[in-house]
């Protein structure tokens, strides 16, 4: 290999890798398979870089569409973009959701104690973007209660503040009542399930 190429590669090894470039240079790894338990004496899984990589991929998917934002209900997509996770029954009740806008700083709505937890233990999130919220729990709370209408109004306000009120919103998974409320408030909804799977 020419000296110039070696020098360039050497400089890249010691610099911070760009978010969208996978770290797959196995030939130069001292440890082929890094352990998952963090220790002070080795760099193992770089979770900071993992979070940046995931969000960058999701942003790349968003920017490839005409959408002003992605509204995410699939809890794996919520984890992928916000790096937050709540186990148990909350996963399939459609009560957690995230909004990824073109500024790259996602919003997350969660039940109250979880929203507080994210503010304490997820410093990569803007604290003002971790919201307490509740929707319909897959029909257990009737739409007439007004929680869905309030949530859509809040989302519409955030889009207006970002200058995106006329842009379509991509949704990966949605309850009918939420979809109908978005349409009633004049929001154009498009399917971005495959876009997020590609991210």
Predicted regions and their residues:
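A composition/biophysics-driven feature that prefers long, compositionally simple stretches
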Residues: 1-199
């Amino acid at each position: 290999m020419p000296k110039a190429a070696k020098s360039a590669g050497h400089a890249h090894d010691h610099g911070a890798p760009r978010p969208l470039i996978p770290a797959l240079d196995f030939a130069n790894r001292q440890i082929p398979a890094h352990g998952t338990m963090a220790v002070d004496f080795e760099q193992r899984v770089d979770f900071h870089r993992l979070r940046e990589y995931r969000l960058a991929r999701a942003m790349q998917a968003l920017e490839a569409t005409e959408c002003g934002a992605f509204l995410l209900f699939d809890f794996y997509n919520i984890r992928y973009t916000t790096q937050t996770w709540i186990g148990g029954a909350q996963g399939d009740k459609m009560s957690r959701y995230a909004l990824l806008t073109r500024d790259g700083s996602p919003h997350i709505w969660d039940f109250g104690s979880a929203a507080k937890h994210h503010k304490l233990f997820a410093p990569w999130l803007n604290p003002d973007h971790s919201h307490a919220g509740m929707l319909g729990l897959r029909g257990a709370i009737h739409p007439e209660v007004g929680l869905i209408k309030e949530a859509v109004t809040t989302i519409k306000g955030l889009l207006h503040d970002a200058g995106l009120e006329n842009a379509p919103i991509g949704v990966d998974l949605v309850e009918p009542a939420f979809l109908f409320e978005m349409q009633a408030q004049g929001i154009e909804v498009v399917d971005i399930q495959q876009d997020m799977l590609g991210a």
